[in-house]
Structures are given as structure tokens and as C-alpha cells.
Amino acid sequence: MAIIASTFGTGLSYAGELPFKPVTGGEVGRKQQRMVVVRAEGGGGINPEIRKNEDKVVDSVVVTELSKNITPYCRCWRSGTFPLCDGSHVKHNKANGDNVGPLLLKKQ
């Protein structure tokens, strides 16, 4: 899995062509549009090697100050309610033979 572009402080590092048109000296006063695109490369799976002997990798963290008893956070990046999990990993796991699951924050 590789990251195509990422930001560091106020700078921008990237691989490939810029996804925006940079502002040049003749375009003073125009706002510069910036976009960072991050894309996973490789096979269809999100989890290539972690705990592959389990049907679904789910980790739980106990936290004392939460408003709900349990809060699932997405780790497959496919949730329509990101960063919260909506169960999209189930379809992804079936289609790709993967075993990614949510991070569960539990109230103590």
C-alpha cells in the first residue's frame, strides 16, 4: 500500500502530476486551489498481513469518558459515515477475501 501524496507542515510532497494548476506571477490575486489525493495501491485487500488467521480483525479500546457505551470507527475507508463505521467492510471483505473490521471504543 502506498501513499500518493501527503502534507508535511506547510509544505506539500507529491508523486506524479499536480492535481491543480499552480498560481504563476501573471495570476496575482487569484486564490490557489490545492487538493491532496491519497489512494491505496495494490491488490483488493486493505489488510495484507495482520492477523490473517481471524475472520475479522476488530480491536476494542476501553475509554472512561465517552457519551455512548460503544462507538465503532471505520478502518476500511469505505464507510459512508466516515470516520464512524457503517458496516461497509462486510461487503468489501466478501468481495476481496479480506478480514478488516472496525475499531471499537467502549465506555468503561
Curated annotation (Swiss-Prot):
Binds 1 [2Fe-2S] cluster per subunit. It is found in: Plastid, Chloroplast; Mitochondrion. Its main location: plastid. GO terms for molecular function: 2 iron, 2 sulfur cluster binding; metal ion binding. Signal peptide: none annotated. [2Fe-2S] cluster binds at C74, C76, C85, H89. GO terms for biological process: leaf senescence; reactive oxygen species metabolic process; regulation of autophagy. Disruption phenotype: Late bolting, early senescence and increased tolerance to abiotic stress. Its cofactor is [2Fe-2S] cluster. Keywords: 2Fe-2S, Chloroplast, Iron, Iron-sulfur, Metal-binding, Mitochondrion, Plastid. It comes from the Eukaryota. Changing H89C: Increases 2Fe-2S cluster stability 10 fold. Loss of iron-sulfur transfer activity. Homodimer. Plays an important role in plant development, senescence, reactive oxygen homeostasis, and iron metabolism. Acts as an iron-sulfur transfer protein. Belongs to the CISD protein family. This is CDGSH iron-sulfur domain-containing protein NEET. It comes from Arabidopsis thaliana (Mouse-ear cress). The gene is NEET.
